[in-house]
């Protein structure tokens, strides 16, 4: 079971690196293969893990740095549209608690207002169909 989770994470990382390389086409600067540029914002993929959601199901949790390069404060939640797919089907969001006493979830950082030039770590969680099939994530800037 642990070995299949490691394979899934490797496949996810490969998919995100491919996505980020396509997103950054045409730029002259040295490229970080985990950096995704979305207009006024940048996402830096930091990793993924499988956690248990509030109902005991397997969920994938992506960790990203969200940088606001715009001129006004912005939050990840209202700036980035994310889609996560597995087996050709869009995955549902998952509720993964970090503190059951306060009901804090892994996605709390998405609500943080980020000043221009600042960066905040965000996480996002989705219910997995299985722990062996690859997962593909795409990100777009909200217009």
Positions of predicted regions on the chain:
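Sec-dependent bacterial lipoprotein signal peptides
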Residues: 1-23
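Sec-dependent signal peptide cleavage junction
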Residues: 19-35
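Short structured motifs
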Residues: 30-32, 44-50, 105-110, 122
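Short strand-coil-strand connectors
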Residues: 37-41, 87, 140-143
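Hydrophobic residues on conserved beta-strands that form the core of alpha/beta folds
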Residues: 38, 43-45, 61, 76-77
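The feature marks short-to-medium sequence segments in extracytoplasmic or secretory-pathway proteins
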Residues: 54-55, 67-119
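Short, well-ordered beta-strand segments enriched in hydrophobic/aromatic residues
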Residues: 60-68
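Short, surface-exposed ligand- or partner-binding patches at beta-edge/loop junctions that are enriched
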Residues: 120-143
């Amino acid at each position: 079971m642990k070995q299949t989770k490691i394979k899934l994470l490797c496949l996810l990382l490969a998919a995100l690196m491919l996505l980020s390389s396509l997103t950054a086409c045409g730029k002259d600067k040295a490229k970080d293969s985990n950096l995704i540029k979305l207009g006024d914002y940048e996402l830096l993929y930091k990793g993924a893990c499988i956690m248990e959601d509030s109902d005991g199901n397997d969920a994938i949790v992506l960790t990203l740095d969200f940088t606001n390069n715009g001129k006004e404060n912005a939050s990840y939640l209202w700036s980035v549209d994310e889609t996560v797919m597995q087996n050709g089907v869009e995955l549902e969001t998952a509720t993964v608690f970090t503190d059951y006493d306060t009901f804090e979830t892994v996605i709390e950082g998405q609500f943080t207002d980020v000043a221009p030039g600042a960066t905040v770590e965000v996480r996002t969680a989705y219910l997995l169909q299985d722990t062996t099939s690859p997962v593909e994530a795409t990100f777009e800037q909200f217009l």
